[in-house]
């Protein structure tokens, strides 16, 4: 629900080059956040506070995932229920991210 437009992901690229900058700019046309493989994350928001909030939320989600990835999946939210949740809160979401 926090990232209804998703998060862009780039594979490892040589840092400090035009190619990683151009690839990031292309992803930013579609996403507010781009994860750079083996580097870090790039984000954009309306304010610096919003941007840091987005990045910190991704970091926390990644921590939770890494701590629980080895556990059996229980009580996951079904895609149909996720649609109900985002519609309840009026969040625009990408239908192509769900298996409906």
PLM region spans:
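Glycine-rich flexible loops
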Residues: 1-100
